[in-house]
Design a protein with these regions (language model features):
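Helix N-cap at the start of a conserved alpha-helix in ABC-type nucleotide-binding domains
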Residues: 72-74
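Catalytic Walker B motif of ABC-type/P-loop ATPase nucleotide-binding domains
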Residues: 61-64
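Conserved catalytic motifs of ABC-family nucleotide-binding domains
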Residues: 57
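Interfacial catalytic loop of ABC nucleotide-binding domains
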Residues: 18, 34-36
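Conserved ABC ATPase signature
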Residues: 36-40, 44
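Hydrophobic anchor residue at the start of the ABC signature
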Residues: 50
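ABC nucleotide-binding domain "signature" region
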Residues: 15-27
Length: 120
């Protein structure tokens, strides 16, 4: 699953394995390397999705509720990964209903209520 973007790009099997292992570790799933998606919990599937999105170091990341179904500790770890992506030059546009999770991070955010701008 995480390897797919790298396979499409035609990367070597060795490089793909290294990158997949690196990102499985980053999202705390290195112990689940051989599992099929149906064997993973909802939160674990969410973390695999984040790893797949980050594995190619994209310039733009669109994240719709990336911390949904995750416990608070894993949510913080995922936001840390997204912050690392921004530090590397990526733009992250994230939607969330969990304002207390993102507010302390002091990143630029906008708040919408019924489609209207409330805070910028």
């Amino acid at each position: 699953n995480i390897a797919l973007p790298l396979q499409i790009e035609g990367q070597s099997k060795k490089m793909i394995k290294e990158k997949v292992n690196e990102f499985l570790e980053k999202v705390g799933l290195n112990h689940r390397e051989k599992y099929y998606p149906q064997q993973l919990s909802g939160g674990e599937k969410q973390r695999v999705s984040i790893a797949r999105a980050l594995v190619k170091n994209p310039l733009v990341i669109l994240a719709d509720e990336p911390t949904g179904n995750l416990d608070p500790n894993v949510s913080d770890e995922i936001l840390d990964l997204l912050e690392i992506a921004t530090d590397s030059g990526a733009a992250v546009l994230m939607s969330t209903h969990n304002f207390p999770l993102i507010q302390p991070r002091k990143k630029r955010f906008i708040e919408l209520d019924e489609g209207r701008l409330v805070t910028q």
